[in-house]
Amino acid sequence: MDAFVRGLHTYLLPTEPGRGPWGLGRGGRPWPDSAREVPAEALRQEPIDVVVLQRPEEIERVVELTGRRPGWELPAVFLEHNTPKREPVTERHPLADRDDIPVVHVTHFNDLVWDSGRAPTVVIEHGIPDPGLQYSGHVERLAFVANEPVRRRRIVGADLLPRFLGAGGIDAYGMGVAELPDALGLRADEIRAMGDLSPDRLHASIAERRCYVHLSRWTSLGLSLLEAMTLGLPVVVLDATEAARAVPPGVGFVSTNVDTLVAAVRLLMADPDEARRLGAAAREAALERYGLARFLRDWDSLLLDLPSARSRRAGVPSTSPLEDRSSDAHRHDL
């Protein structure tokens, strides 16, 4: 979301009393002014061009709030962040029986493993606002970032962390990391719970660690891995889902053999110059593939190609401003 709202559009973010899951708005984030909070009850008065859905239940919620049906009376896309939850290769996507709402996957792996049925699909890979080269690596510990690593233990690879302690201590970041040492039967100094930090504080802290370990078995490509790379950290990565595409040869260590990854951490701990060299290569690779400008161009291309609600109702080719590629058409309300 941090990257998405940095385009040339106006982004309408619903708010509700209590700022719950249906109405968080900006959530206190330092986003551009174009990311505008709107009370949910006022959405009917807004000239919405496109709605970006992220949960299946949002389809009915949009009808309630706008009086318009996504995909039919209101152009819509469904942004799918995740891998399938239940069946790795046979699970049908919630929109698989519809052809009026494109499904946007954030990785090619996700597009491969979801059964999307009739739904048109497109891959728009992550975009990362460049935090700048911050790596120092003077703290000889590993950085590990995951939310709720106890509940999601095997999913995020938290169960593998004890195997790395022979190479170096671990600093864990994210929501729920305070429970991690006890859950793994380890001392608090072996795995230090650093907490859920703001993005700026997180970046500054992990950039001091010697390297970053990414051990997820079955998640979509983690933004924390890409952020670590753009900060200039060398990365040690379990070769699952989209990892091999994110970390090409010569940029970091990628393997399904955990012993190989532990050996890589030992090398980085012993050779700070090599750690710095690999971190610089990781940063260059991440900015080339996951740069913000490419990400925003991809989204603009998709949004400009969406058929208008008018053309859907009338059954005629669209003349919507969404398909007018003049410079004035590059700002829309989302």
Specify the residue positions occupied by each region the protein language model found.
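Short alpha-helical segment that forms part of, or immediately flanks, the ligand-binding pocket
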Residues: H203, L226-T230, T241-R245
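Conserved acidic donor-binding segment of nucleotide-sugar-dependent glycosyltransferases
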Residues: P249-D259, L267-P272
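Aromatic "clamp/platform" in nucleotide-sugar-dependent glycosyltransferases that forms part
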Residues: R217
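A short hydrophobic beta-strand element within the catalytic core of glycosyltransferases
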Residues: Y212-V213
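Extended catalytic core of nucleotide-activated donor transferases of GT-like folds
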Residues: H9-D100, F109-L112
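A charged, aromatic-enriched C-terminal amphipathic alpha-helix characteristic of glycosyltransferases
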Residues: A270-L304, S308-R310, D324
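Conserved catalytic-core segment of nucleotide-activated headgroup transferases in glycan assembly
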Residues: V113-S116, G127-L186, D196
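Short hydrophobic beta-strand element within catalytic cores of glycosyltransferases
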Residues: P234-V237
